[in-house]
Amino acid sequence: MVILRYYDVQAHSAAEEESVLRRLREEDGAVVSVRMERCYHLEYSAQAEHSLALDELLVWLVKQPLSKGQSLSRQPALQSTGSSQLLLEIGPRFNFSTPYSTNCVNIFQNLGYSEVRRMETSTRYLVTFGEGSKAPEAARFVPLLGDRMTQCLYTEENTPKASFDEQLPERQANWHFVPVLEEGRAALERINQELGLAFNDYDLDYYHDLFAKELGRNPTTVELFDCAQSNSEHSRHWFFRGRMVIDGVEQPKSLIRMIMDTQAHTNPNNTIKFSDNSSAMVGFDHQTIVPSSVVAPGAVRLQSVQSDLIFTAETHNMPTAVAPFSGATTGTGGRLRDVQGVGRGGVPIAGTAGYCVGALHIPGYKQPYEPLDFKYPATFAPPLQVLIEASNGASDYGNKFGEPVISGFALSYGLNSAADASQRDEYVKPIMFSGGLGTMPATMREKLPPARGQLLAKIGGPVYRIGVGGGAASSVEIQGSGDAELDFNAVQRGDAEMENKLNRVVRACLDLGEQNPILAIHDQGAGGNGNVLKELVEPGFAGAVIFSKEFQLGDPTITALELWGAEYQENNAILCNADQRELLEKICRRERCPISFVGVVTGDGRVTLLEKPAPKDLEQALNASNRSEVSPFDLELKYVLGDMPKRTYDLKREQTPLKELSLPKGLLLDEALERVLSLVAVGSKRFLTNKVDRCVGGLIAQQQCVGPLQAPLADYALTTVSHFSHSGIATSIGTQPLKGLLDPAAMARMCVAEALSNLVFVKISELADVKCSGNWMWAAKLPGEGARMFDACKELCQILEELHIAIDGGKDSLSMAAKVGGETIKSPGTLVISTYAPCPDVRLKVTPDLKGPGAGSKTSLLWINLENSARLGGSALAQAYAQQGKDTPNLTRSDVLGKAFAVTQSLLGDGLIQAGHDVSDGGLLVCVLEMAIGGLSGLRVDLSEPLAKLKNFDKSVEKLNRPELAVLFAEECGWVVEVLDTDLERVRSTYEKAGVPNYYLGVTEGFGLDSRVVLKNGKSELLDQPLRVLYKKWERTSYELEKLQANPECAEAEYNSLEYRQAPQYRGPQNVQAELTLKRSSAPVRVAVLREEGVNSEREMMACLLRANFEVHDVTMSDLLQGTASVSQYRGLIFPGGFSYADTLGSAKGWAANILHNPRLLPQFEAFKRRQDVFSLGICNGCQLMTLIGFVGSAKSEVGADPDVALLHNKSQRFECRWATVKIPSNRSIMLGSMKDLVLGCWVAHGEGRFAFRDEKLISHLQSEQLVTLQYVDDVGKPTELYPLNPNGSPQGIAGLCSSDGRHLALMPHPERCSSMYQWPYVPSSFEVSPTQSESPWQIMFNNAYNWCVKSNQ
């Protein structure tokens, strides 16, 4: 092998260098400056001649668009010149081929350069210190600049010379027998420590007896490792299934039995519950897009199907604590595969996410309630890093895979208990929560049982030494105290591009309907291959023989133990008939997804791993296992997965000392409010929503953001099941961990109350159809905690029974504690309730943003308070004053909640509610303030009525004679609704007749940031401030976090925009229906939706084209490269959005290379560009492609030619998702020309969307020739470069271009994701929409393209 190195000192922006400089200065104040340089390491076969063509291709791929001169060099530009400078280089570990390398190699191999084996990048840093300062050792800065798990320091001695394999460690011992027969239990104890198996005394006794007495032989290290994973708490849930003895009394039911029994009191609409990777319920009949072929290019069609609705949720806490970004990416990926792994295959639609971390200690933003002396485990990331990087990881994975994140929660908590200062409550071990919605064909609900002769196949990425022992590591009762290397080995790394390919394979199989070759499917998670392959053959204890040489290895040094136990990601295992092998291989080849047929079902009840290839003949494979042959794993399934004895847990209740909340005398309301608003749980979550795609897939009817300025306030999330249906899935979340510190039982009831209070504002089928996932994160095996969790679970099941709803799934994480020094810190016991329910019509909903003032209507506010109480225990107010309180809110009147839910649903269906929001974190005052923020509206609230009617006030405010504080900040179950004054009496009467307490709060008045929020108690004024002042206080913590994760200039610009923003003004067509009129054609108009690997937006594009009467064909780049399709066959060529090759080497670079550098494809595209009867459309990634191949702008399409137009990184230096306002100027486009002067909202979701041009003359030329087709505009419709109105910094707001003849159109925004009105997150009251209008004005552009094709035929 040979490695060539290329250096680029221009690869990093000034903003990136500034960000690194800030981090280094926090570590060492003597740092003056930092320069960065990228090094590309290209490894290729020594037998292959290094061609000039390969060199030129590499230069073209890595060269920055529009860069002047040649920045790439064979020699490094940065050199250390003295003792005050430090030069260090950080790159990937040699034995870990990164996803970046995988994508690079794919690009080269698709272009015929099969000799390229690997391509990695390292970063060189030249750090300069102040005069007189001596540079420290490089090791000091490595943790700040690199990822310990995947990267290492490169030095002269530690740099790959000719191959990344040359410095691999010597092959580790493959596996061996453990001498249990000779040494007894002591041998198990020793291997338990060496391998980090997390065996407790019970396990050690059990496995000693199994091997020494039952089997009479020594176990192998692979077998013991397998048992540790397969039978860990993480996998087996021993605690939830165990016998509970509390204070000497055995409880009649286990935790899991109590939970499962909730199903007896609800509608029986579950189709899957407690028995698969996800849960499911009866869904809807609808039409969906199905391809005519999944192995070749062809037309897609609409097909009627019945879909079940899927939900799943899990956490990924320990990996996220150790490595936040990687832990969150793989947590997201694992949950996605849980959706894929339901029945015979499921399809993900959208995700939810949640984060619970310790005290943040944001630099320069000190909070009085955050203790300053807290320490953290050396192997854990600090809370601030966890919150930023974990949310980055989950967002990045979803963005690249193509799953929007549309709901969630965030909490930062770390306090010394007010009642006992020695008790520290903090999320030292954090929570990373991931939930997901999806659908599954109703005919695919049941996995088929394994039968002799069937094949076991692995679909997805190759085997890596990652996630080794994660199931056991996650089951250790107290983390942070063990071997650091074992902690890091247990963490995985994610590859969203591979997950996308894997998902396409599963979906393709489902598209075959009854011919689906997948008989059963499971996702690979804890326990790796050993667990997932056994799961496939567990039914009936069928058994299988597995051949280790059939697995694709990503690391040549993988041992048998690692192959069997590593939890490497992006991998599913399937069961199929032998005669379906060829079909599956064809599907995977077309989708470029690896597949390995690794085993065969034997029917003998054993699972055997053989270290050899599989025989070609099926009968030989069935009989391949020779019992005299030594193998690393050979056990009967009954010993590993059979019913094992229940474990008994002897628990004791411990009384928690509680102390009454003590608020300062003379407390000012605005001071208390400002503190409360600064809490992560209460304030804006914009730092989360800005960076995550919330619209990809085109099925989103409600995501987090609402109102004119898209404030992240939504109470629920909502998706449709298809682009051709208004039926959908609603979901909401309830979690109240701080109340659980005081009263776990009350906390459980309040979790359900919050979840339903969030769900109430979308019209669902009925309450008894609601099902819940219950996720428990608790240090349950530590003293007192198990009993507390039991009490919470018992109360949870009671309230679910009372409400006639049920749990149908969930997960537990019972090792929520960490060792800090000699102290064990328990994370607050946390329950997350996620509801999901059928929604017959997603258009029947309301959001929190006030509507009246913006519409010029007079409206009033009603408070639905179910308990007639105002208690402050466990509240945001208590946390803001570094306390917990004593008397916590509770829901004792569940019957009233049921009635209130039913009444509100009825009023919603009758159109009598304008807006609604639940009272939760922060209490009533925050609730109404958020409604005002969402609607850019003022309000005038009078507390006279609630103060007169409420019965139970928190004792802390009684002492101060300040009952209004309890009314305003108590987090009792309830919600606030906005109603028209003309409907007020009817609405109040409806609630009162049902016995639901409701209090009149006041009126809305004033529109815009200058409006005022006025709060009174009779004639006594409590608060009177401009909305803009309170809005900025609500946004402040999010702003501080934004500065740490994006370009600080952009963060500041957005924060300061709250001084001048107003509701955006739209201008629609005079007659939408007339504009949507389609011409008649005697022949079909055929268009190709062309997708490269990593594209994720083709289905929403297909839906728009199908509505426009096109004959839509699904065509992959593989089809073009193999010659099974040609672009000459189509009248339209469509390039959808996504992340082709995960944006490796730059957005659309790899995609463009496959066109420009392929001698067969380039002439096809050049000919298509010249034809006068065809058109093309590229959106987002497709837009980036069109600039590179010369379809728009004045770029040439010759090989290697630099474009004159390029899409560069957003000014914010990160991915941006926004509902932006855009204007269509006068333009030549055949699609947008008729829409000139329209001003509309449109989804934007990209990381590299900033248009750049060769020079100013080109911009002037494009504008004068009317080739600019779309511009970002401000709130009054003028083109803007101001962030965030312009989300990427494009000059003059340019967001789209067309060719000089108007036939080729490239847009960065996503009109295909808002072509239906239900997809719009905000519609101004002045924007007239017919009640029967389902299509939005954006559909016009697709219809225009069809009409142009028909006209050009005539």
UniProtKB/Swiss-Prot annotation:
Domain Glutamine amidotransferase type-1: 1087-1337
Active site, renumbered: 1180 (nucleophile), 1310, 1312
Gene Ontology annotations for the cellular component aspect, listed alphabetically: cytoplasm
Matches recorded under Pfam families: AIRS, AIRS_C, FGAR-AT_linker, FGAR-AT_N, FGAR-AT_PurM_N-like, GATase_5
Reaction catalyzed: N(2)-formyl-N(1)-(5-phospho-beta-D-ribosyl)glycinamide + L-glutamine + ATP + H2O = 2-formamido-N(1)-(5-O-phospho-beta-D-ribosyl)acetamidine + L-glutamate + ADP + phosphate + H(+)
Gene Ontology molecular function: any one: metal ion binding
Enzyme Commission (EC) number: 6.3.5.3
Involved pathway(s): Purine metabolism; IMP biosynthesis via de novo pathway; 5-amino-1-(5-phospho-D-ribosyl)imidazole from N(2)-formyl-N(1)-(5-phospho-D-ribosyl)glycinamide: step 1/2
Phenotype upon loss of function: Pupal lethal. RNAi-mediated knockdown in the fat body reduces energy storage of both triglyceride and free glucose, increases waking activity during the day and the night, reduces sleep bout length, with total sleep bout number reduced during the day and increased during the night.
Keyword field: ATP-binding, Glutamine amidotransferase, Ligase, Magnesium, Metal-binding, Nucleotide-binding, Purine biosynthesis
Binding locations of ATP: 327-338, 407-409, 714, 920
GO process annotations (BP): 'de novo' IMP biosynthetic process; purine nucleobase biosynthetic process; purine nucleotide biosynthetic process
SUPFAM superfamilies per the UniProt record, alphabetical: Class I glutamine amidotransferase-like, FGAM synthase PurL, linker domain, PurM C-terminal domain-like, PurM N-terminal domain-like, PurS-like
Similarity comment: In the N-terminal section; belongs to the FGAMS family.
UniProt xrefs under PANTHER family: PHOSPHORIBOSYLFORMYLGLYCINAMIDINE SYNTHASE (PTHR10099:SF1)
General function of this protein: Phosphoribosylformylglycinamidine synthase involved in the purines biosynthetic pathway. Catalyzes the ATP-dependent conversion of formylglycinamide ribonucleotide (FGAR) and glutamine to yield formylglycinamidine ribonucleotide (FGAM) and glutamate. Because of its role in metabolisms, is involved in sleep regulation.
Name of the protein: Phosphoribosylformylglycinamidine synthase
Species: Drosophila melanogaster
Native organism taxonomy: Eukaryota, Metazoa, Ecdysozoa, Arthropoda, Hexapoda
